[in-house]
């Protein structure tokens, strides 16, 4: 096989595990493929050749090129040097073989250089001519004529014809060289211009700004912006679907009303579509990302994500105007009332005031955990540091460490961008305070980055340096490691209690001692595992210690059925699955250990003191004035000075000014401003801001419901759903309204209920320009505009159905994921959303039996009669009370409901809209038709008798007009009987005459299907006006007066 085929066979052998060989491959060929594949490796679908480097133990991976066109292009690129020069064969081979490889690469390089005309000319000029014959050929002379010039031509001719020389091939007369250059004018030429794209965009943008060739007008906040449909549809799928649905592709100009869009967030996207440059204020980044997600502009979303990742990876904090500083408070936080912040030592030797939300506190700038020398001596001045080039660099990449030195205890606080690790001794935990910064700090107790460490490797991140330096520094502290273990053991004993198991307590002590619990919850554990391999896990080391002490470790109980690896890492109580056994052990401590820490202000309980402390901070934020005053009095009573207070660090968002307790919280908070949703579902692609929301969403895709109720048959996907369901059985609910005290089984019900107590805005600020609806929020208006524009942006990925509203799309998508739909026990209808099922049960009319099963009957308090429909109940109550608001204008009979009046009017007009499909007999109402079909056509009785929409509208209009005309003719006949010889003059407008003619036309020509509502209302209003005795003087002068004979009108009917 050829080299390309052999390479493809090797690539197939390395990638295709099911069929590594092509069909029909012989056994000897398979052996060769296996042997050759040992020198190759596949990276990202590309085949690489591993070549051993000389005098080294490493291998160089060279990409194998399979395409002949690409091989020639690579040889050409390696052969051509800078400035148009040509490399030699050795140089070309050297440059090319550094990265690429294929069989016969050297031969192809030689062949290419032989075909290169410029290299051949250079070779011909530089080659020395050593042979005489070559010289004669170059000069155009013959060999014989040069040596024997005295011989005549005859002798030459005889010499050439002699038999001795006849056997030798006669040399042709040398001819001077002629180079023939053939220019092929056929073929396809492909060249690309890198400036063409920008030039076209620039021209389109200029046309947009000068309103040239614009075919769409965008209305945003009352202002018009011209644009091109092709540019908008190329950048946004939203506009493309909009123009296709509305038929605006073929029309000359279209006007798009973008109500609900904000001009500040839309104009940057419009500029990006024409300039490919996205420029916006960082404060409005969230609005831009939300709008780009609505318009399906994926490139803008990628830019927003890259900006956020840059801020995450390089530890950037973006501020509009200002610099980042690492500050630490040296005053006790218990004194926090009033005043402005004291001056801060700046780099220029001046003092600046830093406004904070903590009140009066002295701010000291720390660089790598050391105080400036000028401040130690009592002066304020500059503090140069060789490690920090600028303030921004120190805030972005350096690690601020604050350390205290006391004769009794040591405390180290480590602050990084990704996490905040706090290592405290037992005395500090009991007192819940952190010692103040001592003015004289020794260099041994401070973790700082020295020039030697920085010189070892600049690519090491700050997290890795801090994580590796923690155990080294712990050994350098004056207090030995064994004493620290004893102190931690004493605190662990007080935390766990005497009844806890020894194994768990020891495991907990060790994890807290080494900071594993903090790393586990901060996401650092995986990084530490990747960086350095631990020979023994924490469980193995604890087991070894227990065996050495003569104690036997208790083996966890395992079921005989669960022998798989997955079952060994599954919690038996809650069903959670863990990848590591250590995580399962730590998780089981939550179930088996009692919640000893109770909040004195509320009823919540916690397992750890740190959780209780974090919970109490939330209470102190609500009662800040009272707590500060009580803390100040207790501080004076105890005699402690403000210098020995606890150092509190708060992180302030530069955009909204919100204060956050941790740097991690600030990072999560910044997601709201950037609009980036980093957590995406791999199944449906939905994105979330928080990882917890992604986990809850992923549980919806799971078909298995592992949490089952013990009291009933129901099962649930999440544990929270099971707990909410258990509140129905127990009657106890933790979701209580703080305003009215109403309890709810679910948190969603409480959140919906709480909106009733919140004051709604008096004015709906977002109005629809197409209809009269208005909305409180812009997103509701945007979704509402989808119906007017005909856009259906929400598409189902399973069946490609599209919807305008997100709730309709979500209800449809659940039909694919939900295995067991909600089914009505009466009519059998299936619903994939519980809200729709409840609405159906509440409002659907299943007949009397169905309503009785659902306990929705209404009983009359006076006679005890039961009703299944609300309108029947209301009509019955009107009969008891004597209220009959619906009166017939012909005979004056009043009815309790409009349905009875409509049926009665048909007796005057003679209209019978309900026709039997078998015998074609017509009836006034559906009930009479049902009686007829039950008596004579029992096999053809339908479930429900309804008129079609057009037919029903026609009959309703005909009933109104006929009723009005009958009233008119009856009044005319009465006046005729009173005065038969007189003609009555009736004031009729021209429009009314047209309506009456239309009525007559419908009676003469039954093919006419419907009437206009305006004509009907004109006739009805005219008749009512005649009944009420409207005077002629009140009629406007514009009304045309026509004399009409009553006999003529009656004759027309």
Swiss-Prot record:
SMART domains according to UniProt: BTB, ZnF_C2H2
Zinc finger (C2H2-type): 569-591, 597-619, 651-673, 679-701, 707-729, 735-757, 766-788, 794-816, 822-846, 858-880, 886-908, 914-937
Biased composition regions of type Acidic residues, renumbered to the chain: 141-156
Nucleus listed as a keyword: yes
InterPro entries, per database record: BTB/POZ_dom (IPR000210), Integrase_H2C2 (IPR041588), SKP1/BTB/POZ_sf (IPR011333), ZBTB11_BTB_POZ (IPR048060), Znf_C2H2_sf (IPR036236), Znf_C2H2_type (IPR013087)
Residues bearing PTM Phosphoserine: 1050
A molecular function GO annotation: RNA polymerase II cis-regulatory region sequence-specific DNA binding
Gene Ontology biological-process entries: regulation of DNA-templated transcription
Localization annotation: Nucleus, Nucleolus
Composition bias, Basic and acidic residues: 556-566
UniProt cross-references to SUPFAM superfamilies, sorted A to Z: beta-beta-alpha zinc fingers, POZ domain
Annotated crosslink Glycyl lysine isopeptide (Lys-Gly) (interchain with G-Cter in SUMO2) location: 1043
Disease annotated for this entry: Neurodevelopmental disorder with progressive movement abnormalities, cognitive decline, and brain abnormalities: An autosomal recessive disorder characterized by global developmental delay, developmental regression, variably impaired intellectual development with poor or absent speech, difficulty walking or inability to walk, and various movement abnormalities, including spasticity, hypertonia, dystonia, tremor, and myoclonus. Affected individuals usually show poor overall growth, often with microcephaly, hypotonia, limb contractures, and cataracts.
Protein name per the record: Zinc finger and BTB domain-containing protein 11
Native organism: Homo sapiens (Human)
Gene name in the database record: ZBTB11
């Amino acid at each position: 096989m050829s080299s390309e085929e052999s390479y493809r066979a090797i690539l197939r052998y390395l990638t295709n595990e099911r069929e590594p060989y092509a069909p029909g491959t012989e056994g000897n060929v398979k052996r060769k493929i296996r042997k050759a594949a040992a020198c190759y490796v596949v990276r990202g679908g590309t085949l690489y050749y591993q070549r051993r480097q000389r005098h080294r133990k490493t291998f160089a991976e060279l990409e194998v090129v399979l395409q002949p066109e690409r091989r020639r292009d690579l040889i050409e690129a390696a052969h051509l040097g800078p400035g148009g020069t040509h490399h030699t064969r050795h140089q070309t081979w050297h440059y090319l073989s550094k990265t690429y490889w294929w069989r016969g690469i050297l031969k192809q390089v030689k062949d290419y250089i032989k075909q290169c005309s410029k290299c051949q000319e250079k070779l011909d000029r530089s080659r020395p001519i050593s042979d005489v014959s070559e010289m004669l050929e170059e000069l155009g002379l013959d060999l014989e004529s040069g040596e024997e010039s005295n011989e005549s031509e005859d002798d030459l001719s005889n010499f050439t014809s002699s038999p001795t020389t006849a056997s030798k091939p006669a040399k042709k007369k040398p001819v001077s060289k002629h180079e023939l250059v053939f220019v092929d004018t056929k073929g396809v030429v492909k060249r690309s211009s890198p400036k063409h794209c920008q030039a076209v965009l620039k021209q389109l943008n200029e046309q947009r700004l000068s309103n040239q060739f614009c075919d769409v007008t965008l209305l945003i906040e009352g202002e018009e912006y011209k644009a091109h449909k092709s540019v908008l549809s190329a950048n946004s799928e939203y506009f493309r679907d909009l123009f296709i649905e509305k038929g605006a592709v073929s029309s000359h100009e279209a006007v798009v009303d973008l109500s609900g869009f904000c001009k500040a967030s839309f104009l940057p996207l419009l500029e990006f579509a024409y300039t490919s440059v996205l420029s916006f204020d960082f404060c409005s980044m969230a609005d831009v990302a939300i709008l780009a997600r609505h318009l399906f502009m994926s490139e803008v979303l990628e830019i927003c994500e890259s900006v956020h990742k840059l801020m995450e990876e390089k530890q950037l904090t973006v501020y509009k105007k200002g610099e980042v500083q690492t500050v630490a408070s040296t005053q006790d936080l218990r004194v926090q009332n009033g005043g402005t912040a004291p001056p801060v030592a700046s780099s220029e030797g001046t003092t600046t005031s830093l406004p904070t939300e903590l009140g009066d506190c002295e701010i000291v700038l720390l660089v790598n955990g050391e105080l400036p020398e000028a401040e130690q001596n009592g002066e304020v001045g500059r503090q140069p540091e060789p490690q920090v080039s600028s303030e921004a660099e120190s805030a972005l990449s350096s690690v601020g460490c604050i350390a205290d030195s006391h004769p009794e205890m040591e405390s180290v606080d480590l602050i990084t961008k990704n996490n905040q690790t706090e290592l405290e001794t037992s005395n500090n935990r009991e007192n819940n305070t952190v010692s103040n910064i001592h003015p004289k700090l020794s260099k041994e107790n401070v973790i700082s980055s020295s020039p030697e460490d920085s010189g070892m490797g600049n690519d090491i991140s700050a997290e890795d340096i801090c994580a590796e330096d923690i155990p080294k520094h712990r050994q350098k502290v004056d207090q030995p490691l064994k004493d620290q273990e004893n102190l931690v053991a004493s605190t662990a004993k007080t935390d766990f209690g005497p009844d806890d198991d020894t194994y768990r307590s020891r495991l907990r002590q060790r994890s807290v001692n080494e900071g594993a619990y903090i790393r586990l919850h901060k996401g650092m554990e995986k990084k530490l595992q990747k960086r350095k391999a631990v020979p023994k896990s924490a469980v193995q080391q604890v087991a070894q210690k227990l065996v050495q002490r003569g104690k036997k470790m208790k083996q966890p109980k395992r079921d005989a059925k669960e022998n798989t690896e997955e079952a060994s890492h599954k919690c038996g109580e809650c069903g959670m699955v863990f990848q590591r056994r250590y995580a399962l052990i730590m998780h089981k401590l939550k179930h088996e250990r009692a919640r000893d820490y109770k909040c004195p202000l509320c009823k919540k309980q916690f397992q750890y003191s740190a959780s209780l402390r974090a919970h109490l901070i939330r209470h102190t934020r609500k009662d800040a004035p009272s707590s500060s005053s009580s803390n100040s009095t207790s501080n004076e009573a105890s005699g402690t000075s403000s210098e020995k207070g606890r150092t509190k660090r708060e992180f302030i968002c530069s955009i909204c000014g919100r204060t956050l307790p941790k740097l991690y919280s600030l990072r999560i908070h910044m997601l709201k401003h950037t609009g980036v949703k980093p957590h995406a579902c791999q199944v449906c692609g939905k994105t979330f801001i928080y990882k917890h929301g992604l986990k809850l969403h992923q549980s919806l895709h799971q078909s298995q419901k592992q949490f089952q109720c013990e009291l009933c048959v129901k099962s649930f996907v999440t544990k929270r759903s099971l707990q909410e369901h258990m509140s129905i059985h127990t009657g106890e609910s933790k979701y209580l309204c703080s305003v009215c005290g109403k309890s709810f089984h679910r948190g969603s019900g409480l959140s919906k209920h709480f909106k009733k107590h919140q004051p709604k805005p008096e004015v709906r600020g977002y109005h629809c320009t197409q209809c009269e609806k208005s909305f409180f929020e812009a997103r509701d208006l945007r979704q509402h505009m989808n119906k007017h524009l005909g856009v259906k942006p929400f598409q189902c990925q399973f069946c490609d159905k599209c919807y305008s509203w997100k709730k309709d799309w979500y209800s449809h998508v659940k039909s694919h994921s939900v295995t067991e739909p909600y089914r009505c026990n009466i009519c059998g209808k299936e619903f994939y959303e519980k809200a729709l099922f409840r609405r159906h049960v509440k409002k659907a009319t299943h007949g009397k039996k169905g309503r009785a099963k659902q306990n929705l009957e209404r009983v009359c308090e006076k006679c005890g009669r039961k009703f299944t429909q609300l309108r029947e109940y209301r009509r019955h109550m009107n009969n008891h009370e004597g209220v009959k608001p619906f009166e017939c204008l012909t005979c004056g009979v009043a009815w309790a409901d409009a349905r009875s009046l409509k049926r009665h009017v048909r007796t005057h007009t003679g209209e019978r809209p309900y026709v039997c499909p078998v015998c074609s007999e017509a009836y006034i109402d559906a009930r009479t038709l049902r009686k007829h079909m039950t008596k004579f056509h029992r096999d053809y009785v339908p479930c429900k008798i309804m008129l079609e929409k057009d037919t029903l509208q026609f009959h309703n209009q005909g009933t109104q007009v006929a009723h009005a005309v009958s009233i008119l003719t009856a009044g005319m006949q009465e006046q005729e009987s009173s005065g038969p010889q007189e003609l009555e003059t009736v004031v009729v407008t021209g429009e009314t005459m047209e309506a009456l003619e239309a009525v007559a036309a419908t009676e003469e020509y039954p093919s006419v299907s419907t009437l206009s509502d305006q004509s009907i209302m004109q006739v009805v209003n005219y008749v009512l006006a005649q009944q009420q005795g409207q005077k002629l003087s009140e009629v406007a002068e514009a009304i045309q007066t026509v004399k009409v004979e009553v006999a003529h009108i009656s004759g027309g009917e």
